[in-house]
Every structure is written in structure tokens, then in C-alpha cells.
């Protein structure tokens, strides 16, 4: 029995692959055979000398296809539901058209083969097979070759009542109301471009609608007994609720597919999600990397090489791995997460992708000649082996950054609190206190003074005429730090203090700042520090934005950033 089941499953897979590979031309005979492969009952009747009608039916759906023999084309297609609900929307508005049109008819008249009709017919049959209405008295076995659909209807004692045609039609209204109550600027459309589904769209830069995600029902391949409940949006509680525990169906899930991640032609436009932010139970399908695509996010690749705008100094602040996710399971109470997932999709599209495009430069214009990496990053770039490691999207260790970022990190992170993240507020506070460039702790704890004779500086106590404003007593100790790049300037010493270094004269009081780094550097005024993480971006002391800001704040940040780097 097991061998027989395995044979049938393999045969079904081969049939599905063949139908996708060579769907066949649009004829009445081919449509009849296609319906039979799904287990639909079909028969043909002659309405006149010129018109034939193919009627195909299952438990709920009845589809009539009128074929004009004289003109050799499909003339009309109608869908009727054998249930109390007969208001299922099988119309849509095609691009460039103002009126809604019949999806099933378009599938058979506007395409060269049966592929579009086959996909739409499979969706209708899925809703039919997993719907359980009151008129069902026994399990329905229509002889389908899809064994999973038959097995889902095999035990009626473990089934609830749920009309998926009715629920799917009402779901779009619930989602639209949810967005309205939560002030989410998204548009909801039922069916798009002759495909069934609930589409979430947003306004693009050129004013056109851009699809972000598609919501539809799909067979749960991992758990045939998974219970899908009828969750609706309540305007009173402003949340998704299940009013009846008896309204459910087994073996089906509600899926949200990221439309951008369904198109792998432009790899830089994929949406990358933070792994630690998402529960594994939500992930149905990840995007697999093609052989000619990098397996790490483009914005992460910038940290492993120096191919970026010379006016920008990148600092990596990512704390989690970024992964591609194609489909999310939003069944039942997971419907609450739709807004959060879409928020990240918007953040990735508007901010992360645009930052990458603005910072990226051709290799000939990169700053790699001046800023050599201190350490080779442990993941490959697009010109190396794409499949050498599965950890390519791991956040880059801070010690593995290229030279410019490491040097900046030393300057910014030389305080006693080594785990402290660099903050742009520190520079503002020091300006208010009269210290324009350096932190007092950095000046006192990690000086690096180059002596002509090469001898180390001897430890001396320093006397002061009076206490400084911050209440510190200045002292210089013999601390050797070969990695530091900071040397004191004359304006870095507080007024009212005097320091004696060995037998230095008064003329030596003004200590000239020297760059002890072996690497040439550009003036700091012309290089802006850009701190990038999965949920926030800081552009020096000029501007910043984060995931939780309004979309308008993101757009303003990108506009300002574009003006600076262009």
C-alpha cells in the first residue's frame, strides 16, 4: 500500500510538472482533459450548430464553458456555486482597463495556452475541496488524482463548518478595515492581472500602484490535520477574533507571499528579513539563491569590500542575520502580524535598498586604494564562490570590518565602556561643553604621542592651577596603545591647565597633532560616517531614521542622503 501511494504521488508530481511545462493549446478537448486531471466531473452538450458547452463540476463549483465552433474560440465562461453563498468575485481589473472583466474568460481568450486557466482552476478546486458546508452529509470523494485533497475530506467527524468561498470574499473587506483603523496607507484589491488573490498595494514614486504582497489560501503540506479557523476583524475590539470554534477546516493555511521576492530577476530588489525578528513557525518558504546571484544581501556585501562612495564611511551595526522569505503563514491569530510584515517590506524598499543604491559605486570609483581591509571578511562577494558558505548573511563581526570602519570604531569606541554603541549625541554634548572634537576620557586615557628620540614617555604627575569645569584632575600615564589613531591637539587641552613632559620648554606646549596611522586618510570634514543596522540608520550628526518612524520620515532621510552623496 505504501509503495502504491508513493507511486501515485510521484505520478501526480510528474503530471503537475508536465502541465506547467507544456500546458497545451486552448481547445475544448484540452480543457476537458485538464478538468479530468483534477478529478472534476465533465460533460459536453450541443446548444446549437455553432455553440458547444462544456460543464465541469465538483462539490460546490460548477463551471460552464461556451465554445463557438464556427469562430474556433471560447465565447463565454460562467461560475456558479452550489451553496447558500453565490457572490464569489471572479472578476478583476486588468492593467490599462477601466472595467472589471471575467478572470476565467480572460484566461481562455487572452493567453496563448492553458497555463493561466489551469492555475485559476486549481485555486477554485482548492476552495471547493476544503470547504465544508451544512449540505455536506458525507465525505466527498470525486476521484481526484490529488490524494491529499481526498484525504482531507475522509473523516467528517473531525471537520468543522467553513465555506471558504464566502470567507475569502469577506477577508478582503476585513483586511481593508484593519488597515483603516490602524492608519496603514495600503490599498487592498481582490484579484489582479487575471489571478485570484487579495493583493496589498502601495503608491509608487511615479504615482502607480506597486504590489507588495499577495494573500491566498494554500494546502498545508506539512500538517494535513492543521486547523484553519475563521478569524474575522472586529471593529469593536480592533483585533482579529474567532467567533465560533466550530468554524474551521483541516489541512489548509492562509499565506502571504511577498511579491517582490517572487521575482528574482533583480536580486538587489529582494526583501531581506531579520531572522531574529521572525518566528520560524511563520516561515513557509524561503527564496533560494540562483547561481548567478549573491547569497548575501547587497547592503551587507558593502561591509566586506571597499566598493562604496568615497564620501561615506560605513559602520556595521547589524545584530542579526538577514534572510529571504517568500511566504508567511498568517493563518488564525497570525493575521495580527500583517501590518508588521508590511512595515518591514516598506522599510526595506524605501530605506535599505535606496541606501545601498546611493552608497554603491563602480569599482573604478571605489575608495579601496586608500582604505585597505584589516581582515578578509568571512563571506563571499558576488565575484567569488556564491555557494561556499550558508552563513553569508551573518552580521559581520566588528573586528572584521575594513580599515576605514575599524579606525572609526577605535575613535568612537575608545571609552571605558567598550560595549557601548557609538552615539551621535556624544559629539553634541562635547560641543556644548567646549570640547569640539574629542572626549575627555579619550584624551586622558589613551594618548599617543610620537617622540623624536623614540623613548617612551615617563610617568609624571601634572599640577593644575584650578579644577576644570567637569571636576577632573588632569593626569597623563604611560599607556602604550599602538592601535590608536588619536593624538592630542593644543585645543584639546582645557584652558587653565599646565602640563610638563620631562624637560619640555614653553615653546613645546603646543603639541601638533600627528596621524600615526600607516594609511592615508581624507579630511574628516569630507567623509561622513554612516551607521547601518537592520532597523536604524544614522548619517553622522546630520540625520537619522529607524523602522518605527513614519514613512514620511524615511523619505525625507533618503532625499537628504541623496543630496549629500550625489
Swiss-Prot record:
Q: Which GO terms describe its cellular component?
A: core mediator complex; mediator complex; nucleus
Q: Give GO terms for biological process.
A: negative regulation of transcription by RNA polymerase II; positive regulation of transcription by RNA polymerase II; positive regulation of transcription elongation by RNA polymerase II; positive regulation of transcription initiation by RNA polymerase II; RNA polymerase II preinitiation complex assembly
Described function: Component of the Mediator complex, a coactivator involved in the regulated transcription of nearly all RNA polymerase II-dependent genes. Mediator functions as a bridge to convey information from gene-specific regulatory proteins to the basal RNA polymerase II transcription machinery. The Mediator complex, having a compact conformation in its free form, is recruited to promoters by direct interactions with regulatory proteins and serves for the assembly of a functional preinitiation complex with RNA polymerase II and the general transcription factors.
* Protein family (similarity comment): Belongs to the Mediator complex subunit 1 family.
- Write out the biased-composition intervals (Basic residues): 410-421
The record lists the lineage as: Eukaryota, Fungi, Dikarya, Ascomycota, Saccharomycotina
Please give the residue ranges the record annotates as the region Disordered.
361-425
Kindly list the GO molecular function terms attached to this UniProt entry. Answer: transcription coregulator activity
What are the disulphide bonds in this sequence? none
Which residues, renumbered to this chain, carry the PTM Phosphoserine?
A: 155, 423
In its miscellaneous comment, the UniProt entry states: Present with 4675 molecules/cell in log phase SD medium.
> What gene is this protein translated from?
MED1
Q: State the name under which the record lists this protein.
A: Mediator of RNA polymerase II transcription subunit 1
Q: Which InterPro entries match?
A: Mediator_Med1
Quaternary data = Component of the Mediator complex, which is composed of at least 21 subunits that form three structurally distinct submodules. The Mediator head module contains MED6, MED8, MED11, SRB4/MED17, SRB5/MED18, ROX3/MED19, SRB2/MED20 and SRB6/MED22, the middle module contains MED1, MED4, NUT1/MED5, MED7, CSE2/MED9, NUT2/MED10, SRB7/MED21 and SOH1/MED31, and the tail module contains MED2, PGD1/MED3, RGR1/MED14, GAL11/MED15 and SIN4/MED16. The head and the middle modules interact directly with RNA polymerase II, whereas the elongated tail module interacts with gene-specific regulatory proteins.
Q: State its location(s).
A: Nucleus
Matching Pfam families: Med1
Q: Which UniProt keywords apply?
A: Activator, Nucleus, Phosphoprotein, Transcription, Transcription regulation
Q: Which domain of life is it from?
A: Eukaryota
